[in-house]
Amino acid sequence: VVAPILHGKNGEDGTIQGLLELAAIPYVGCGVLASAACMDKAVANTIMDAYHVPHCHWCSAVRAEAETQRSTLLTRVENRLPYPIFVKPANAGSSVGITKAHNREELNTAIDTALREDDKVVFEEFIDGQEVECAAIGNPDNPQEVRTTRPGEILAGAEFYTYDDKYKN
């Protein structure tokens, strides 16, 4: 049995899970579809919207729009979300490529930062409050049984929980 304890592209996006399934190798964790859907922040937000799960306001753009219609994109994002705005690559983990933009100039630069990691960019509203994390662990033999870990508070060293906060500090 494989425990795919991997981060980021190819590790938690369904790629390794799909490879393991093709090779008929049992593994623990989420399957291909759940992994892929949760790795892509735009897809995950769309699913949460469809099921009326409360979460931050958001919008997204693809590289072509960001490169050919930048001014229109900036205006669309500003009309949808108040500053500060989190700008994220849709398919990256560990806070890689994430920027907290406080104005139009920072928003413009943040789009370029996110595009270095992915071809799709997600924009999310900033929500001021306590941030906690908790894992939910399902049981495939009994889908009604779900256990959770104890919640832990995230204490960011900077304005948000950065890569350095997660792995270096």
Q: Which residues does each PLM region occupy?
A:
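Short catalytic-loop micro-motif centered on adjacent basic/acidic residues
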Residues: V2-I5, V28-C30, H57, V122-E124
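Glycine- and other small-residue-rich loops at beta-strand/loop junctions that grip anionic moieties
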Residues: I5, K9, L33-A37, T99, ...
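Fold-independent oxyanion-binding glycine-rich loops
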Residues: L6-G8, W58, P89-A90, F126
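Contiguous, glycine/small-aliphatic-enriched amphipathic segments in soluble metabolic enzymes
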Residues: V1-H7, D13-I16
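Glycine-rich phosphate-binding loop signature in dinucleotide/nucleotide-binding domains
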Residues: V1, R80-L81, E117
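Phosphate-binding site of ATP-dependent enzymes
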Residues: H102-N169
